[in-house]
């Protein structure tokens, strides 16, 4: 009897609770009003009393293309609520059994979409929970009225600037339909995020949910109230099983009807072939949702062309796994010949969206009709700051030098350039976006925008140059220390071999060669360091030039003294005299090569006051006495001369500020990354591997000077044409000058009088005697 009374009381309490479900959000609803759309499917909305997703009441409404239309649809499906605005949800949700229009039953299909929240009554900002070690922040811009996506990006970047992850966020100050003037957000450290994730996993089986015991059948409804952490996140839907104990009678009836729909032979059991056919047909319907574009406006910004899968699990972990599987799929247009612009999410390239011409079928499912929804779906499962490898530059600067110094330096150099390229790419994208937004601005405002980005680019270039200079100087100092250690060790071994009793000449000569090679590398490092400083900072090079020459003289003296010790040991120098002479010839040859190399370098950079030809020649004469045996600054061993990328070589960089290399103005939009040439800041090629800095070059205004090579060729061609015209004109004038008028050939007798001779000349020039002419006319 007691059990019956308890059961009746429980039923009465449940009935009372159901009857008292309020219709005003301020009084509390079991679920927040939301609508979800998937083109080709019937619109879905949440039943605020049960928390379940239900299809459109009319069974005809599908995806809507405008925010005003979405607001109107919210008002239609929730007539009892005062819907005043809509806003995108922060997280995608999974909806089970979402059928295409015209179908009543479908199973085992989960669709992941980003729903719209229908805001009730006067706007009230979301109550965000701030866990331990987290920070609550907000930003408002009264002169801006931006979308949900814009403010989500602002919050995400703000957390990233603080080396934290975006935990939760909400909109502030509505200024239109799905438009706002600010955002509030919570940033948490990565460790706190992981702790909260583990706490949520432990609480997955909990039935605590604001609204009652119906949470087993709810679908990821977002309740934004100041509740505990496990209530702040999406509620965990569970799998609905046919044999679950305590299942309500209504669910049993629906399951029986579904089995009967697939029971074609009347045996009372589900026909698996029919079910498989239905699933295959549903798969075709889903492909049509991606492939058919005739019925869908490509410009609809709210079309949730999301992703589908054939799994029955609906835990939050499985939803994130499905989203990750599709969002991380590689770009594939498919075999079909359609050409539909879409967006795909590149998780490898810094969570960036790229445009993709989707073929309509057979391609990857990672394609979205707008960048907005691509980011909304895919960014939910990607942390704000993806785990990145430790900064190689910091690691290099903090780690002491070892035998792998050159390899560590190369790795740090590549990391530095990659970071610089990433920064420049980000600025380029921001510049292009600002350019698009500034098309209708006055010319003065455009100039301000251009100047701001010019300053930003220049600051990035100067920062990168400073970091490069620090990296190279550190590498030079470490190489010098390593060379000193090697030289000291080689000299100690050489002296030890000389002091042996009796000494072994061949062994002594071998150690002497090692010591000489160490001195050569020290000298080569010193010269390269001076050339680098002379290139990037001539004033500093002028200051250190005396120290460089002194160091080279010290190297020469040490080598001469070491060779002198060889002749103090009886019998050793005589046994290896031939090798010593060969070493002397190599010294002379390498000295000449070094002199030529120095001359070439000086000419390539232009004659300057630091290293004039005559002065350097005198210095070489002083430092390279030919009568010395192994001494001389110019001595370079064949095994180490002009050797590429050895541990003793330092590769100079161009660390000059940007204004010395040309300041960019603005990027040109619409160019592929392959078409954008590389901006290469490089030093002269001095027969050694040099520090070449490659990054993507911003292509700027047309007034920037183009290729000088084309201008030179044009001038040369023009000069040749002008010279040809002048020559032809002179020839023609000269020919005309020597041309005379002749009406015939007249023989002149040498015995005639001067008067007759003069008359003959006049007749040659066309003179006619009027008397003769008169009589000729009379006779005729």
UniProtKB/Swiss-Prot annotation:
Residues 29-124 are annotated as: GFLD subdomain. Residues 194-316, 648-669 are annotated as: Disordered. One of its GO terms (biological process) is central nervous system development. Disulfide bonds join 39-63, 74-118, 99-106, 134-188, 145-175, 159-187, 327-378, 336-361. The chain crosses the membrane at residues 712-732. Gene3D superfamilies: 6.10.250.1670, Amyloid precursor protein, E2 domain, Amyloidogenic glycoprotein, copper-binding domain, Amyloidogenic glycoprotein, heparin-binding domain, Pancreatic trypsin inhibitor Kunitz domain, Pleckstrin-homology domain (PH domain)/Phosphotyrosine-binding domain (PTB). Residues 240-300 have a biased composition (Acidic residues). Residues 29-190 form the E1 domain. Residues 392-583 form the E2 domain. Residues 301-316 have a biased composition (Low complexity). InterPro entries: Amyloid_Cu-bd_sf, Amyloid_glyco, Amyloid_glyco_Abeta, Amyloid_glyco_Cu-bd, Amyloid_glyco_E2_domain, Amyloid_glyco_extra, Amyloid_glyco_heparin-bd, Amyloid_glyco_heparin-bd_sf. Residues 733-780 are cytoplasmic. Cu cation binds at residues 148, 152, 169. It comes from the Eukaryota. Its main location: membrane. The record marks 171 as: Required for Cu(2+) reduction. It is a single-pass type I membrane protein. Keywords: Amyloid, Copper, Disulfide bond, Glycoprotein, Membrane, Metal-binding, Protease inhibitor, Serine protease inhibitor, Signal, Transmembrane, Transmembrane helix. GO terms for cellular component: cell surface; early endosome; Golgi apparatus; Golgi-associated vesicle; membrane raft; plasma membrane; recycling endosome. Functional neuronal receptor which couples to intracellular signaling pathway through the GTP-binding protein G(O). Belongs to the APP family. This is Amyloid-beta A4 protein. It comes from Dichotomyctere fluviatilis (Green pufferfish). The gene is app.
């Amino acid at each position: 009897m007691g059990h019956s009374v308890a059961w009746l009381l429980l039923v009465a309490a449940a009935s009372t609770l159901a009857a008292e479900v309020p219709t005003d959000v301020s009084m509390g609803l079991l679920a927040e009003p939301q609508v979800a759309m998937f083109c080709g499917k019937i619109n879905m909305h949440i039943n605020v009393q049960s928390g379940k997703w239900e299809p459109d009441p009319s069974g005809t409404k599908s995806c809507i293309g405008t925010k005003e239309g979405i607001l109107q649809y919210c008002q239609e499906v929730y007539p009892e609520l005062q819907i005043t605005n809509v806003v995108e949800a922060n997280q995608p949700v999974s909806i089970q059994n979402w059928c295409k229009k015209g179908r009543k039953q479908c199973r085992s299909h989960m669709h992941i979409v980003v729903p719209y929240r229908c805001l009730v009554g006067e706007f009230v900002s979301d109550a965000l929970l701030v866990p331990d070690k987290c920070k609550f922040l907000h930003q408002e811009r009264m002169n801006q009225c931006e979308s949900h996506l814009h403010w989500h990006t602002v919050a995400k970047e703000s957390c990233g600037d603080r080396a934290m992850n975006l935990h939760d966020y909400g909109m502030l100050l509505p200024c239109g339909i799905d438009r706002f003037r600010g955002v509030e957000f919570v940033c948490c450290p990565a460790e706190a995020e992981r702790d909260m994730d583990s706490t949520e996993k432990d609480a997955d089986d909990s039935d605590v949910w604001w609204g009652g015991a119906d949470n087993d059948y709810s679908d990821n409804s977002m309740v934004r109230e100041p509740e505990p952490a496990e209530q702040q996140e999406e509620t965990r839907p569970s799998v609905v099983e046919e044999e679950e104990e305590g299942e309500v009678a209504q669910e049993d009836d629906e399951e029986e009807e579904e089995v009967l729909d697939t029971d074609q032979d009347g045996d009372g059991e589900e026909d698996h072939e029919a079910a498989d056919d239905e699933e295959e047909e549903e798969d075709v319907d889903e492909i049509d949702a991606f492939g058919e574009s005739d019925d869908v406006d490509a410009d609809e910004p709210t079309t949730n062309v999301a992703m589908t899968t054939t799994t029955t699990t609906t835990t939050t972990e499985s939803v994130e796994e499905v989203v990750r599987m599709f969002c991380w799929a590689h770009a594939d247009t498919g075999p079909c010949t359609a050409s539909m612009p879409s967006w795909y999410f590149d998780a490898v390239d810094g969570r960036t969206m790229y445009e993709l011409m989707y073929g309509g079928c057979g391609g990857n499912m990672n394609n979205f009709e707008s960048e907005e929804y691509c980011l909304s779906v895919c960014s939910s499962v990607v942390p704000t700051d993806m785990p990145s490898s430790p900064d190689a530059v910091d690691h290099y600067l903090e780690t002491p030098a070892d035998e792998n110094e050159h390899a560590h330096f190369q790795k740090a150099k590549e990391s530095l350039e990659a970071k610089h390229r990433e920064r420049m790419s980000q600025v380029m994208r921001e510049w292009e976006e600002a350019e698009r937004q500034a098309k209708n601005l006055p010319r003065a405002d455009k100039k301000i925008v251009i100047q701001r980005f010019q300053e930003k680019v220049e600051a990035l270039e100067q920062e990168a140059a400073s970091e490069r200079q620090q990296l190279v100087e550190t590498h030079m100092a470490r190489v010098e220390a390593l060379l000193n250690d090697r030289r000291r060790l080689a000299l100690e071994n050489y002296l030890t071999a000389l002091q042996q009793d009796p000494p072994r000449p061949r062994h002594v000569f071998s150690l002497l060669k090692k010591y000489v090679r160490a001195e050569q590398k020290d000298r080569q490092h010193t010269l390269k360091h001076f050339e680098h400083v002379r290139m990037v900072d001539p004033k500093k090079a002028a200051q250190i030039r005396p120290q460089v020459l002194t160091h080279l003289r010290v190297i020469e003296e040490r080598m001469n003294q070491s060779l002198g010790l060889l002749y103090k040991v009886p019998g050793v120098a005589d046994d290896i005299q031939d090798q010593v002479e060969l070493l002397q010839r190599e010294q002379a040859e390498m000295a000449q090569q070094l002199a030529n190399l120095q001359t070439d370098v000086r000419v390539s950079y232009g004659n300057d006051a630091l290293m004039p030809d005559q002065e350097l020649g005198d210095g070489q004469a002083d430092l390279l006495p030919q009568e010395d045996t192994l001494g001389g600054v110019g001595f370079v061993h064949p095994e180490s001369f002009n050797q590429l990328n050895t541990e003793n070589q330092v590769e100079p960089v161009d660390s000059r500020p940007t204004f010395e290399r040309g300041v960019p103005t603005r990027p040109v939009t619409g160019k592929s990354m392959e078409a954008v040439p590389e901006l290469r800041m490089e030093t002269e090629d001095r027969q050694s591997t040099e520090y070449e800095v490659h990054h993507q070059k911003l292509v700027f205004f047309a007034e920037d000077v183009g290729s000088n090579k084309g201008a030179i060729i044009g001038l040369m061609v023009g000069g040749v044409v002008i010279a040809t015209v002048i020559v032809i004109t002179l020839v023609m004038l000269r020919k005309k000058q020597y041309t005379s008028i002749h009406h015939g050939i007249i023989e002149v007798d040498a015995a005639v009088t001067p008067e007759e001779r003069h008359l003959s000349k006049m007749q040659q020039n066309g003179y006619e005697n009027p008397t003769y002419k008169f009589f000729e006319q009379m006779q005729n």
